[in-house]
Amino acid sequence: MGKVWSKSSLVGWPQVIDRMRRQQDPAEGVGAVSQDLANRGAITIRNTKENNQALAWLEEQKEEAVGFPVCPQVPLRPMTYKEAFDLSFFLREKGGLEGLVWSTKRQEILDLWVYHTQGIFPDWQNYTPGPGVRYPLTFGWCFKLVPLSPEEVEEANQGDNNVLLHPMCQHGMEDPDKEVLVWRFDSSLARVHRARELHPEFYQNC
């Protein structure tokens, strides 16, 4: 039996076992491609740019100038609870996201940056529907989207320095409920999966 597995057969095994130990399940709430990456180690033919919105969107980004390379610098992987948790606290510490007005383009830039630097497939940043507070579907991501009151929007729009195309000046045009949303950090989201409590139907196939 010892002849079958010689010393030469063990080349690379330390790296393999290290990868196995570091393997984590995807965070609850990630998309179908991330589930593929976690369960099968690759994107399968079940998910294509024809039937998966995230894949189609990512393909489009490769053809546009977004300010930094789109291809990931590290192996492609799904968002895990720990990754989402660590990213949340990293962004909170560095600043910039807290209180920033949400827009589709800004969310896409964040998704692409995480994809490029960490190799995390961009189907993890999704939120519960409105109106009202939108909670992250991915457990571990501690930023929710909070609507501003009409008074807060008007106050922010006062002055001569406002840019007409700034998300604040769009009065929620991108949001189905016409609300101006901002990212807000909420550490309780690391302990309580509010999205699953409010919308268990979103997790039936997870």
UniProtKB/Swiss-Prot annotation:
Listed HAMAP family: NEF_HIV
Record key words, sorted: AIDS, Apoptosis, Early protein, Host cell membrane, Host Golgi apparatus, Host membrane, Host-virus interaction, Inhibition of host adaptive immune response by virus, Inhibition of host autophagy by virus, Inhibition of host MHC class I molecule presentation by virus, Inhibition of host MHC class II molecule presentation by virus, Lipoprotein, Membrane, Myristate, Phosphoprotein, Secreted, SH3-binding, Viral immunoevasion, Virion, Virulence
Family: Belongs to the lentivirus primate group Nef protein family.
Main location: host cell
Site positions per UniProt: Cleavage: W57, L58
Region feature (Mediates dimerization, Nef-PTE1 interaction): 108-124
Annotated region (SH3-binding), positions in chain: 69-78
Motif Diacidic in this chain: 174-175
Location within or outside the cell: Host cell membrane; Virion; Secreted; Host Golgi apparatus membrane
MF terms (GO), sorted A to Z: GTP binding; SH3 domain binding
UniProt-annotated stretches for the region Acidic: 62-66
Residues lipid-modified (N-myristoyl glycine): G2
GO terms classed as biological process: symbiont-mediated suppression of host antigen processing and presentation of peptide antigen via MHC class I; symbiont-mediated suppression of host antigen processing and presentation of peptide antigen via MHC class II; symbiont-mediated suppression of host autophagy
Post-translational modification remark: The virion-associated Nef proteins are cleaved by the viral protease to release the soluble C-terminal core protein. Nef is probably cleaved concomitantly with viral structural proteins on maturation of virus particles. Myristoylated.
Organism in which the protein naturally occurs: Simian immunodeficiency virus (isolate EK505) (SIV-cpz)
Name of protein: Protein Nef
Tree of life domain: Viruses
Function as written in the Swiss-Prot or TrEMBL entry: Factor of infectivity and pathogenicity, required for optimal virus replication. Alters numerous pathways of T-lymphocyte function and down-regulates immunity surface molecules in order to evade host defense and increase viral infectivity. Alters the functionality of other immunity cells, like dendritic cells, monocytes/macrophages and NK cells. In infected CD4(+) T-lymphocytes, down-regulates the surface MHC-I, mature MHC-II, CD4, CD28, CCR5 and CXCR4 molecules. Mediates internalization and degradation of host CD4 through the interaction of with the cytoplasmic tail of CD4, the recruitment of AP-2 (clathrin adapter protein complex 2), internalization through clathrin coated pits, and subsequent transport to endosomes and lysosomes for degradation. Diverts host MHC-I molecules to the trans-Golgi network-associated endosomal compartments by an endocytic pathway to finally target them for degradation.
Annotated spans, Binding to ATP6V1H: 148-180
Listed SUPFAM superfamilies: Regulatory factor Nef
